[in-house]
Amino acid sequence: MHLLITSAGRRNHLISCFREDAASLNLPLRILAADFRPEFSPACRQADAHFAVPHCADSDYVPTLLKLCREHEVRVLVPAIDPELPILSAHRAAFAAIGTHVVVSGPEAVAVSQDKGRTAEVLLASGIATPRTLSLADYLHAPKRLQHPVIAKPRTGSASQGIVRPNSAEELTTLNPQDYIVQELWEGREFTVNVFFDRAGRMRCAVPHERLEVRAGEVSKGVTRRHPQLEEVAWRLPAALSDAAGPLCFQAIVRDSGEIAVFEINARFGGGFPLAHRAGAPFTRWLLEEAIGCQTTAADEWRTGLTMLRYDAAVFFDE
């Protein structure tokens, strides 16, 4: 079976998880990887084959991937970064027509996850607490509507890029009001919850881990925690994201008082997924089981208290 990871970048851990799970299923799996510059992608170097594709914003991106999937009989396509999610979600039917299942949520869940303003609105409408949020324009008009301290975030940003922690509203006047939202800044323990939905849209598992240390927006030290209140929030996600599918993750703050606020949703594999995988929630195995039509082993059974400490590794190759 052929599996393709797009925008593979540094997702070597994802390749390793798929290989480990394919071996446990006795499944011959060939992993392909695609990137804008695959020669400088560590994950592409680890894959069985790699391919150069246009940037996901290019009009040739989808036709190129369709051609690649058709020629190599790709059964499963796994997108790795946020910008390609709405594009691939919108073209799921075209890929399905050639026998390729795209591991991505439906357009609504993707749209909600990619707009922090909409994320806050949908969470509140579903009864899930989130920090009080205003558009930058509304905040500048009436900053006292939010309790300080506050944090300004790009509406569609990721990896903690572009975040501003202002001391006053005046410090935000140079930002584009259309591009930013402003939230009350909660202090507390930060968690990510990795969540898995099967192809029928049923949520099967939720694995919280505490983010002990973060680097460039991705957890570098973390530990799995059984947290009933956080898990209860996770199991309410299907009501908020009716067309969710595959892996998702969300981030939350837990105050010392026990209050919980969700402030971000990612409709893809989270960077900290290897911790959930090692703890006994192999989303990658469950995706392979779905692809080959065998009975799923998906279950909400995993180890609490498992710690992950990350370090840098290198890939070497001759020119």
Where are the model-predicted features located?
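ATP-dependent carboxylate activation and anion-phosphoryl transfer catalytic cores
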Residues: 72, 228-319
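Glycine-rich phosphate/pyrophosphate-binding beta-alpha loops
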Residues: 160, 212-218, 222, 266-280
